[in-house]
Swiss-Prot record:
Expressed in subcutaneous fat, heart, skeletal muscle, brain, colon, thymus, spleen, kidney, liver, small intestine, placenta, lung and peripheral blood leukocyte. Residues 241-250 have a biased composition (Acidic residues). SUPFAM superfamilies: PH domain-like. Keywords: Cytoplasm, Phosphoprotein. Pfam families: PID_2. Increases proliferation of preadipocytes without affecting adipocytic differentiation. The gene is PID1. It is found in: Cytoplasm. Found in a complex with PID1/PCLI1, LRP1 and CUBNI. Interacts with LRP1 and CUBN. InterPro entries: PH-like_dom_sf, PID1, PID1_PTB, PTB/PI_dom. Induction: Up-regulated in fat of obese subjects. It comes from Homo sapiens (Human). The modification Phosphoserine is found at S236, S247. This is PTB-containing, cubilin and LRP1-interacting protein. One of its GO terms (biological process) is cellular response to cytokine stimulus.
Length: 250
């Protein structure tokens, strides 16, 4: 029985081969042709698939820009107006200034003389009515005095008073019932201190009384906080608190 050698060359001249060999050789050539067609079609399919993927990729490229830029734009839209329309809770007042005072025992009427001095200084430049030039905000542990511009808007300049350093406050003054004043212990650069009396004029007597009550409440919260932290002895009375605060804060 005749069989095709394994090392048979793919020769164009097959006349010397038997008919069975010719048919086998023809079959091999057809198989090779089919393989080439399949490979070509596969390459075309891969090329087509790659082009489709490229199209899809190109279409999706702008999406990250939308995803990352949109929230940023929304954030700017929401935060920018808030910065422009930022408001502070507090009472609009006319800050009369401060003057140094002496003594360590602050009783009823101790702010009358300093307030009269500040009132006289301020009335020299007074026209008809004092325009509000500050916003006084009393918080649990601090008092913020926001200075206003000529438009009545809060500026970046603000004076901060620690409630623990406030020795006395009152809204009871003979010169004007609308004045609220407080005595504050100011620490100097050389660690020495001085007692300053600050005064503001409110729009009404009621507003001045409200500030006095708010200051008293802030002082109470500060006292209880320092007492719970052990910074004030449990048997300390309200009269001894100012001395405790001064020794602790100095």
């Amino acid at each position: 029985m005749f069989s095709l050698p394994l090392s048979l060359p793919l020769c164009e001249d097959t006349a010397f081969l038997p008919s069975k060999c010719c048919s086998s050789h023809k079959t091999i050539k057809q198989a090779r042709t089919l393989i080439m067609i399949f490979l070509a079609s596969g390459t075309h399919f891969q090329t087509m698939l790659k082009s489709k993927l490229n199209v899809l990729t190109l279409k999706k490229e702008p999406l990250p820009a939308v995803i990352f830029h949109e929230p940023e734009a929304i954030e700017l839209c929401t935060t920018t107006p808030l910065m422009k329309t930022r408001t502070h809770s507090g009472c609009k007042v006319t800050y009369l200034g401060k003057v140094s005072t002496t003594g360590m025992q602050f009783l009823s009427g101790c702010t009358e003389k300093p307030v009269i001095e500040l009132w006289k200084k301020h009335t020299l430049a007074r026209e008809d009515v004092f325009p509000a030039n500050a916003l006084l905000e009393i918080r649990p542990f601090q008092v913020w005095l926001h200075h206003l511009d000529h438009k009545g808007e809060a500026t970046v300049h603000m004076d901060t008073f620690q409630v623990a350093r406030i020795a006395y406050c009152t809204a009871d003054h003979n010169v004007s019932p609308n004045i609220f004043a407080w005595v504050y212990r100011e620490i100097n650069d050389d660690l020495s201190y001085q007692m300053d009396c600050h005064a503001v004029e409110c729009e009404s007597k009621l507003e001045a009384k409200k500030l006095a009550h708010a200051m008293m409440e802030a002082f109470r919260k500060t006292f209880h906080s320092m007492k719970s932290d052990g910074r004030i002895h449990s048997n300390s009375s309200s009269e001894e608190v100012s001395q405790e605060l001064e020794s602790d804060d100095g």
